[in-house]
Amino acid sequence: MSTRQLCRRSFLYGIAVFVLGTVSMSGSVRAQEVLKIGVLGVMSGPAASWGLVNKYCAETSAQLYNEQGGFEIGGKKYKIEIVPIDDKNDPKLAVSGAERLTKQEGVHYIIGPNVDTTAASVQPVAEAGGAIYFPYAFQKTLYTPPHGNAVLGMIASYQAGPIIYKYLMDKKGVKSVSFVARNESDPLNQRDEGVQAAKKLGLEIKSSDDTYEPGTTDFFPVMSRVVNKGADLIVLSGVAPADAPLLIKTARELDFKGTLATETAQDIKILNEVAGAAADGFICVGGASTPEIRSDEMEKFADRYKKVAGEWNDEAGTKVYALEIILATLKKAGPEAITNIELFKKTMPDFAMKNPFIKGDKMLKYVGTAYFSQPRQIGVPMVVNEVSDSKFQTLFVGSVE
């Protein structure tokens, strides 16, 4: 063999080794499988903080797991990829978003949507596409047989409402109540549930038919009617974070001296910026993580959340739970459940883990059977807050079984 042939063979061999090495290296880089989790919700407009907190929570948890090499399911670590979509609180956009997640992205687990109308609109898409979704909406039919693909991600208004009303009756002597709601199905449903609960407790209903249209900025006409009814308590049913401070401020400017409350979560920054001192005494459902009960893991999450979102939002204490329980349930169900949600569903009734976000040994599990005839709710702590000196102060902590 000539020297030229020898050199040529050595050169070709070198190329082959390089190519094989490159393929091997790139193969090892690609070896880690990706687990996609969708986040579908309202991320713009008056209710934007509801969906954005879902997104930031999922991204925060994903970062923390991915920095440790991923989340282990069946002996294999998966990189967590969050796929967020803004549905703008529009049922049509929610449907197209759910279709994109299930059909194009191959997602089988979705966090959101945030209200009844969008959650109901994606139900057929989730069921047809083999997806489990975790809405923050309270319509009972979403979670009740024959449906089984939706899991309530928070405390519902009809669970928190009666407890808040009873507390105010016992602690503040409240005897009468008026309700005001935005003229949309979600707030109207919450109002109706609240009226029923108030009646059962023996509260006098001063009024419950006053509503305002989406996009309202002048609340004096509607709140004048409500305040003039003379109730001890005004409930802002299903109020969006951008509307709440305007309603509160208007009520106080109309010289309302009683208590204002809602069964939904709110944003203290928006309350302070718009309502200011008028928000003092306002009662709402809080995030499921008060400073008194936070574990070290929750503190770590909160620190990272601030870097991801720019600031802490009290509601993140509730919405941290969605991705955590999805991953933990998949771990127990096995890797096949990543694409087969029926295995996930079979695991849910007996699933239990130590709650990683609160001190002590309290277990985290799926609850809600008393309301939905099946366990289709994350068992997050129920925290009720009162605004005091521009901060949320915890009134009490409860739970739903």
Language-model features, listed with the residues they occupy:
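N-terminal signal peptide c-region/cleavage motif recognized by signal peptidases
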Residues: 24-26
